[in-house]
Amino acid sequence: MNSITIDNVCIRWLGHAGFFLGWQDIKIYIDPFQINKEPSFDNKADILLITHDHFDHCSPEDIQKVQRSDSTTLIPESCSLEFRGYTRRVVEGDILAEGFEIKGVRIEVLPSYNLNKPYHPRGFGVGYVVELGEIRIYHAGDCDFFPEMKSIRADVSLLPIGGTYTMDEEEAASAVAVISPKVAIPMHYGKLEGTNGNPEKFKTFVQGKNPDIKVIILDS
């Protein structure tokens, strides 16, 4: 399966770090990459979230496939690209709520960085928590297990496990243990060189740390 529905929120893995979130009539895309088929107009993005400007997260070709002329796109300040519709540059710590929500959706902008690798320095990219109804969904972006994760509140966590550029399976499981979501979904593995993480290995590590957390492995 490539999608699950939790409390009326559809979560679909698009492959790599890309996800589609559907709730009521709101369609959200995060880091779309190598999308095979352009969605119908009704399934294009109300909101598009980009975590950083590496080619496998900020792909103009794929963004064009999912965007409408009235889409709202959030990108980190380090990203120099411009897109159709309304583009808002964000930094960690931004909270789009209390009158600044996008189409009724509360979005928190979080740090996302490497601790012991040069690929994603702090301030280069961001993560997001998207609040849809009663569900909080955390997309970590490309990162290691960093200290601020201890304060993240999420019901569903989407975490990279590929190693090399991000956390590996065991580090991601440690992140899951401190975030303590109800559901953890691995991402950023199996598509590109240097993303050789094993989702079953991740699941085993998570279950060893907290068997109450459900790990769901989606097909792209």
Predicted regions and their residues:
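Short, Asp-centered acidic motifs that coordinate Mg2+ and/or phosphate
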Residues: 27-28, 47, 156, 183
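Cap/insert and terminal regions of metallo-dependent hydrolase folds
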Residues: 74, 144-220
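A short acidic, amphipathic alpha-helical/loop segment
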Residues: 61-66, 82-86, 148-151, 171-175
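Short glycine-/small-residue-rich Rossmann-like dinucleotide-binding loops
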Residues: 53, 111, 162
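Active-site metal-binding motif and surrounding structural segment of the metallo-beta-lactamase
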Residues: 34-81, 153-158
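Divalent metal-coordination and catalytic microenvironments
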Residues: 21, 31, 52, 59, ...
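Core dinuclear metal-dependent hydrolase active-site scaffold
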Residues: 1-43, 91-152, 167, 219-220
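Short, charged/polar "capping" segments at the starts of alpha-helices
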Residues: 79-84, 193-196
